[in-house]
Amino acid sequence: QNPSAYLTLEDDKLLYFGQKVDGVIPYGVVGSTIVINGDPICADSDFPVLLAEFKEFCQRSAHNLFFISVTDHFLEEYKKQGFGWVKNGEEARFHLADYEISGKKGAKMRMNINHARKAGVVVHEYCPLKQRDAQIEADLNRITNEWLQQKKSSMLTFVMGTVGLENPMDKRYFYATDADGKIVAFIVFVPFLGKRGYMADVTRHGTGAPSGVMETILYDAFQVFKNEGIEYGSLGVAPLAGLKNDSSNPVEKLLCFAYNHLNDCYGFRDLYRAKEKYSPTEWVPSYYIYLPKIPTPDMFYALVTIQNPHQIREAAEDLVKGCAQRLRNKRTSPTHQSKPSRQVSWTASSSTKQPDTRKQTDADKKAD
């Protein structure tokens, strides 16, 4: 039921297998914290036993626990066993039978797709388990390299999968070609809900990809899934989206502050907007679950580090650059020149970057 479940098969996870019941829990270790991606994988009836067993396993080795990307499916049992919890974002999900882009809500999506179609974009599915194509795979690798150069930051791990062409298993690959037949972008989907749903896990575009290409790939892939009888599509979780600014939970207050003020470090707002433009049919809440009930700073450090060991350094550099740019803008603005200088106040509005709609964005999630 959790779209993150398939990522258990990636090589960056350690696996805990149940001793008393059948089940598996994917995790990683940073210092004294064990980080778990998604819910434990087991039958619903076995979940209480598996969770208690894993909790004891971690406590015996004096490790704290931090679950990420957890659904509300087992939320009450986590609470019952003494875990703390807080909403950490919302998953953009699509009920494919109801998904459409007509009307005002889908206007931007239609515009982007029409732009791509006019530019000659055509979407194809690549099925490596049926027949490998060395040229297609070389092009997908080229796009990954171009995408990384555009990002100028490290790639996320643990919460995201890999392209995985060496062992595709149940992954689905959709790519787009331009008017010249050149591959310019691709999306890798992973299954969830027993293949009743597919999540866009890896989303990448190359240099010079036409505007609207990612929207076109996603829409066409969803149409293929819909025709196959698949029920759901997903773009994964938009981190820190949908939190309450007036929450009494101190952890949620901290996360709200990050969402409102630290977009120089991580584009929380931009990522939410990138998913929102696809017009999801529902936003599914996602949670952090942790023990002890009040998470310590080193637990949050583990959360960041396990996804990208370089992210803290890169975030600090981005924050400094963002602050410096705003300071330069303030000094050169007519308002600033006509009035006495004042102390700069970094407000939520001034620290929020506005997305460039002419450029392609990574629908994932995840800005990895």
Name these PLM-found stretches.
Residues 35-45:
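Glycine-rich phosphate-binding "P-loop"
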Residues 356-358, 362, 368:
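Asp/Glu-rich intrinsically disordered low-complexity tracts
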Residues 1-35, 63, 67-84, 99-112, ...:
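A conserved beta-strand-loop-helix scaffold within acyl/acetyltransferase catalytic domains
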Residues 258-264:
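Active-site rim elements
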Residues 338-341:
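Intrinsic disorder/low-complexity segments enriched in small, polar and charged residues
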